[in-house]
Amino acid sequence: AGLFAQPRL
């Protein structure tokens, strides 16, 4: 979870 949980910023 966190920024790494999203495909891109």
UniProtKB/Swiss-Prot annotation:
Q: Which family does it belong to?
A: Belongs to the periviscerokinin family.
Q: Does the keyword Lipid metabolism apply?
A: no
The protein's organism comes out as Delia radicum (Cabbage root fly)
A biological process from GO: neuropeptide signaling pathway
Q: Name one GO cellular component term.
A: extracellular region
Name of the protein described by the UniProt record: CAPA-Periviscerokinin-2
Q: Which domain of life is it from?
A: Eukaryota
List Leucine amide occurrences by residue: L9
Q: Where in the cell is it found?
A: Secreted
Question: Which UniProt keywords are given for this protein, alphabetically ordered?
Answer: Amidation, Neuropeptide, Secreted
Q: In which tissues is it expressed?
A: Expressed in the CNS and abdominal perisympathetic organs (aPSO). Not expressed in the ring gland, midgut or thoracic perisympathetic organs (tPSO) (at protein level).
